């Protein structure tokens, strides 16, 4: 692959904010803006997943240099659905909103709406063109993905001593004034990853433990004072090839009809290849199996094969197609949708 094409692709797939537009940089103060417009259509026999799914995502990242050792920073990101009526108040949501301080070689500490520690691992397989990353990660589900009330400490290269060894410590305050499946009590999480000093291979692991709320324990399914999860992952990223796998287990955490699963076992895998003319095919698999569910026993909660591809016109424009081949039984006890979905679209990002 030629170097210019590789640089474009890496910048796109790593993070939307990597190629943010710098709007201000003066006297130690810096402000970047980033965003994307995703024009997307779903095709499915499942009515709620059929039709226009377009949205706009926009955010900013700011920094201020306090002294040669200390930096303040903040980030905000929101999403606006374009398939809703203008009068629909649900068309906008805040994805991220946090502020913090970073001390050189010691690490960073921030508070707000952020990514949970468990997602540090699952992010490695959340790489499909549209779907993926949904075996155990769910928004506002303890510390599995984006969540509120997170105090997060992050340290890279382990205080400057071990290259490639990154550590996260996280605390989540209780959130009770919301839908019961989005609630959480006080909790703690941690994650660690190591790339063996900059090699093409990396491993990671995470653990979270949280109190559950009284209302959660009143549900028909899933009881227990604590919600617990652990995860591990590996990835290889070199020679135009990306391969990653993920495994996790949760206890009294994953929402199901009528409450929560007492236990889940989750697996994800993805393999992608980057052609030098811009095409990136993708093949993946996602499975979440619920265990010991009251009145059910064991049941697949998520089970699908994913086949997709992205074509990068340049660093700002891409087209994609993603086929979610659902493997759930049509007569599953929990009434989970078993229809396939095809997503097709164009993405402009900056």
Swiss-Prot record:
One of its GO terms (molecular function) is porin activity. It is found in: Cell outer membrane. InterPro entries: Gram-neg_bact_OMP (IPR050298), Gram_neg_porin_domain (IPR033900), Porin_dom_sf (IPR023614), Porin_gammaproteobac (IPR001897), Porin_Gram-ve (IPR001702), Porin_Gram-ve_CS (IPR013793). The keyword tRNA-binding does not apply. PROSITE patterns: GRAM_NEG_PORIN (PS00576). GO terms for cellular component: cell outer membrane; pore complex. Coiled coil: none annotated. It is a multi-pass membrane protein. Induction: By phosphate starvation. It comes from the Bacteria. Gene3D superfamilies: Porin (2.40.160.10). Residues 1-20 form the signal peptide. Its main location: membrane. Keywords: Cell outer membrane, Ion transport, Membrane, Porin, Signal, Stress response, Transmembrane, Transmembrane beta strand, Transport. GO terms for biological process: monoatomic ion transmembrane transport. Homotrimer. Belongs to the Gram-negative porin family. Uptake of inorganic phosphate, phosphorylated compounds, and some other negatively charged solutes. This is Outer membrane porin PhoE. It comes from Salmonella typhimurium (strain LT2 / SGSC1412 / ATCC 700720). The gene is phoE.
């Amino acid at each position: 692959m030629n170097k210019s094409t590789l640089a474009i692709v890496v910048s796109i797939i790593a993070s939307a904010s990597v190629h943010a537009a710098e709007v201000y940089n003066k006297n130690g103060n810096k402000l970047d803006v980033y965003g994307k417009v995703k024009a997307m259509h779903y095709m499915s026999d499942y009515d709620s997943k059929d039709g226009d799914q377009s949205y706009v995502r926009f955010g900013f990242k700011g920094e201020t240099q306090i002294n040669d050792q200390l930096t303040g920073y903040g980030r905000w990101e929101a999403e606006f659905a374009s398939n809703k009526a203008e009068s629909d108040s649900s068309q906008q949501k805040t994805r991220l909103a946090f502020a913090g301080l970073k001390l050189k070689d010691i690490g960073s500490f921030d508070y707000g709406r952020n990514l949970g520690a468990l997602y540090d691992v699952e992010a490695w397989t959340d790489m499909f063109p549209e779907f993926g990353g949904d075996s155990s990660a769910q928004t506002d589900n303890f510390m599995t993905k984006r969540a509120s009330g997170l105090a997060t400490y992050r340290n890279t290269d382990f205080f400057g001593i071990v290259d490639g060894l990154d550590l996260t410590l996280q605390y989540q305050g209780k959130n009770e004034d919301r839908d019961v499946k989005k609630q959480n009590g006080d909790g703690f999480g941690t994650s660690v990853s190591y790339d063996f000093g900059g090699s093409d291979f990396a491993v990671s692991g995470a653990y979270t433990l949280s109190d559950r709320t009284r209302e959660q324990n009143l549900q028909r399914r899933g009881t227990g004072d604590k919600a617990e999860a652990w995860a591990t992952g590996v990835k290889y990223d070199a020679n135009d090839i990306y391969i990653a796998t993920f495994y996790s287990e949760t206890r009294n955490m994953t929402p199901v009809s009528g409450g929560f699963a007492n236990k889940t076992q989750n697996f994800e895998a993805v393999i992608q290849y980057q052609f030098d003319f811009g095409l990136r095919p993708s093949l993946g698999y996602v499975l979440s199996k619920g265990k010991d569910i009251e009145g059910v026993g064991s049941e697949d909660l998520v089970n699908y094969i994913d086949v997709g591809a992205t074509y990068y016109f340049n660093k700002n424009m891409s087209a994609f197609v993603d086929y979610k081949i659902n493997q759930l039984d049509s007569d599953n006890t929990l009434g989970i949708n078993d229809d396939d979905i095809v997503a097709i679209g164009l993405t402009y990002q900056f």
